[in-house]
C-alpha cells in the first residue's frame, strides 16, 4: 500500500502542479486512496520531495531528481535563502528565519544538509525556521552569513 501510494505521489507531482500537502492528499483520494495529511507529510519526507518556486509567491512539490540539478548543497542553500528569506533575527542561541509561505521546510533541510558546525539543528514550520546554535557566540556570524546570502 505504501509503495503504491508513493508511486502515485510521484506520478501526480510529475503530471500536475501540486502546491500543498492537502492538494496532494485530495489527488490521492481521487485515486481511491484514503490518506491523512500526516501520512502525506511522511511520504513527502521519505521520497525527498522538495518545493520549487513557480513564481515569487508560489511553489510546487517536485521530485528529488530536480534537486540533483543543483550541483552543490551550498549553491542550493544560497539560492533558497536569496529567493525565499524575508527576515532574520535571533534570541540567545536561536536564529529565527522567516521565509515566504511554504518554504521553511526546504530552507531548513538545505541548512541541515550543509552541515554547518555551529548548527545543532533546525525546526521548521510553514514560514518560520528556528536554528539552534552552539556556541552562543556563533549566532552573530551565522546571522551575518545568512544575511549576506540573502542579498
Curated annotation (Swiss-Prot):
Keywords, comma-separated and alphabetical: Amino-acid biosynthesis, Arginine biosynthesis, Cytoplasm, DNA-binding, Repressor, Transcription, Transcription regulation
Subcellular localization, as worded in the UniProt entry: Cytoplasm
One GO cellular component term noted in the UniProt record for this chain: cytoplasm
Keyword hit for Transcription regulation: yes
Pathway: Amino-acid biosynthesis; L-arginine biosynthesis [regulation]
GO terms of biological process kind: L-arginine biosynthetic process; protein complex oligomerization; regulation of arginine biosynthetic process
Name of the featured protein: Arginine repressor
Endpoints of the signal sequence: none
Family annotation (InterPro entries): Arg_repress, Arg_repress_C, Arg_repress_C_sf, Arg_repress_DNA-bd, WH-like_DNA-bd_sf, WH_DNA-bd_sf
Family assignment from sequence similarity: Belongs to the ArgR family.
Gene Ontology molecular function: arginine binding; DNA binding; DNA-binding transcription factor activity
Coiled coil (residue ranges): none
Primary residence: cytoplasm
Domain of life: Bacteria
Organism of origin: Heliobacterium modesticaldum (strain ATCC 51547 / Ice1)
Functional note: Regulates arginine biosynthesis genes.
Amino acid at each position: 500500500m505504501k509503495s503504491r501510494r508513493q508511486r502515485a505521489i510521484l506520478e501526480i507531482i510529475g503530471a500536475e502542479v501540486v502546491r500543498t500537502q492537502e492538494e496532494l492528499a485530495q489527488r490521492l483520494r481521487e485515486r481511491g486512496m484514503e490518506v491523512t495529511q500526516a501520512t502525506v507529510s511522511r511520504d513527502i519526507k521519505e521520497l525527498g520531495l522538495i518545493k520549487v518556486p513557480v513564481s515569487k509567491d508560489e511553489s510546487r512539490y517536485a521530485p528529488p531528481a530536480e534537486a540533483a540539478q543543483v550541483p552543490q548543497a551550498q549553491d542550493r542553500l544560497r539560492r533558497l535563502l536569496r529567493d525565499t528569506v524575508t527576515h532574520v533575527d535571533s534570541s540567545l542561541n536561536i536564529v529565527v528565519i522567516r521565509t515566504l509561505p511554504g518554504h521553511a521546510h526546504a530552507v531548513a533541510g538545505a541548512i541541515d544538509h550543509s552541515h554547518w558546525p555551529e548548527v545543532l539543528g533546525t525546526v521548521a514550520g510553514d514560514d518560520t525556521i528556528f536554528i539552534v546554535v552552539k556556541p552562543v557566540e556563533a549566532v552573530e556570524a551565522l546571522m551575518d552569513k545568512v544575511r549576506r546570502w540573502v542579498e
